[in-house]
């Protein structure tokens, strides 16, 4: 009996000496924000990295033509950024066409923190849509 008790104590001591599991590694990339907005002709689902002044943020834009449900092809997609309540554009950028039809990628670099509005202008042979959106916070 004494021998069994000694073995149990030894096993418990050895188990207590093991290292705890390391914490999971922190994600290097910030979590993307997303929104879905509509006009009468276009669905715009877009994802973007949190906006920080002076740092570029990628915007991934997924466009669908609501007249037939197809991806919006060969469009020029321009994003105009202005301070909330102002008519003057602070930044304007044109997206590049993504690898998949209907997906476009833009990079925004807003120079100073504050509240902003972004207007998406989507233009191709079939569409010429403007989509003014608000409630973008730049930190």
Regions found by a protein language model. Give the residues of each.
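Sec-dependent bacterial lipoprotein signal peptides
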Residues: 1-16
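Intrinsically disordered, low-complexity terminal tails/loops enriched in metal-binding residues
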Residues: 16-139
